[in-house]
Amino acid sequence: MFLIITRDTMFFTAMKNILSKGNVVHIQNEEEIDVMLHQNAFVIIDTLMNNVFHSNFLTQIERLKPVHVIIFSPFNIKRCLGKVPVTFVPRTITIIDFVALINGSYCSVPEAAVSLSRKQHQVLSCIANQMTTEDILEKLKISLKTFYCHKHNIMMILNLKRINELVRHQHIDYLV
């Protein structure tokens, strides 16, 4: 069984056509996940305008104990699902490489453009969603010094001189 988590109906239609050999289920919100029915599924997550990280959605996915998770994202988030095997792929992956990845064959899937820790991605998502510093500190339960350290590291990783350049960053749509 394949669970396709996306808000993009064209993406889902494409996945359904590619994965025609199996049972393909479209999931748009966490209430649609049935922990018993979808147990041990193969999960494919599209994060474009659908940032499911750091939400109850990801907790629900972890409870499913999926066989494998493929995440379409320019960000590689270290240990985002604990011990669940996760592969991050860009949306520009070829169909041949994607099918090889689904079948468990070796394929030369390019690495994600940016590699972040869970906490760095969480801080980056909060900044992209225009939360104030105080709200971020309260939500993430971190100190001001830790926040500035994460912010500085993120700016170095993304090659930003000022944090307000983030709104024009090529991957901003994957954070909201």
Swiss-Prot record:
Miscellaneous notes: Overexpression causes filamentous biofilm formation.
Record keywords: DNA-binding, Transcription, Transcription regulation
SUPFAM superfamilies to which the protein is assigned, alphabetical: C-terminal effector domain of the bipartite response regulators
Lineage: Bacteria, Pseudomonadati, Pseudomonadota, Gammaproteobacteria, Enterobacterales
Residue spans binding DNA: 133-152
The protein's name: HTH-type transcriptional regulator DctR
Residue ranges constituting the HTH luxR-type domain according to the UniProt record: 109-174
Single annotated GO MF: DNA binding
Task of the protein: May act as a transcriptional regulator of dctA.
GO BP, sorted A to Z: cellular stress response to acidic pH; regulation of DNA-templated transcription
Induction notes from the record: By acidic conditions. Could be induced by EvgA via the induction of YdeO.
